[in-house]
Amino acid sequence: MQAAPVSEALVDLADEVLVHTGQHYDEAMSGAHIHATRLPHPRHNLGVGSRPRDEQVALGQERIAEVLEIEQPDVVVVRGDTNATLSGARAAVAARIPLVHVEAGLRSYRDDMPEEHNRIETDRLADLLLAPTPGARTNLINEGVSGRVEVVGDPLCDTLERWRPEIVPAEGEYLLATVHRNYNTDAPERLHAVLECLARSPWRVTFPVHPRTRAALKSWKLAVPGNVDLVDPVPYTRMLELERGAQMIATDSGGVQREAYLWGVPCITLREETEWVDTVAAGWNVLVGVDPDAFAKALEHPRPQERPNIFGDGRAAHRIAQLVVELASSELEAAA
């Protein structure tokens, strides 16, 4: 959804070809989100679907390579840390097309996270690395990446500023929960501990269930606490309403951690680490893993008095668009 402001910023500067890999195979996770956020309709939908990571990355690379052969772009832009990100990065490098990585330099230092491997390899391949925060830039400099590094801010900040006037907080007192990381859903004892955490909430828990999580709950036959309301995945704008209206948010999602911070809603992260360390340093995000006692303690964590501006001024998309066009222009001049 963070592609929307960047696409808007590029409208008058370049011809953008938006590619949707189909990594999120559930309609509520993809098509409905694209519709809700008014993203331009993707010119190519690759239908990669759900499959083991290595297969997903390889198939995504193969199909993106076919798109690159058809479209012949001057620059390839990838964002974030998904398998699709890595597929696009590898395809661009193989085709000798300059690569831009948006959201570069983030590190959780957790080796068993596929997202961490995706980030690191993409950063090593990129020609232009666009870091959302100064800390992310520092990570890249310390790693000695070969590409050019620029701090641009977080496009997610642009997205929320765009939607803020239209997002009415959901009613009622509730804790909002999201869980989808493989290490939280693929081990029954860990997913059970997540449910034990949610059972400690003094409010009812609204839990939009990711397809991976729903399948795991069913597979492991885990009992859902009585205070937890499982609901189907919701469109992005509805998710923002739920976030804005929540008393607190419990999540293992990097995006939701940032959205919680930008809404000013305290967050409990169901991980032992986070790539968004600034939210923890500011006191708005508490890391508890899946320890129910730590979760209960975090529920009592005092709301900070201040919320520093750590994600930029809402103009990240403008900076990204300008830098992408500059890179494309320089490549064309060099080839002339």
Language model segments and positions:
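Conserved C-terminal portion of the radical SAM core fold
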Residues: H210
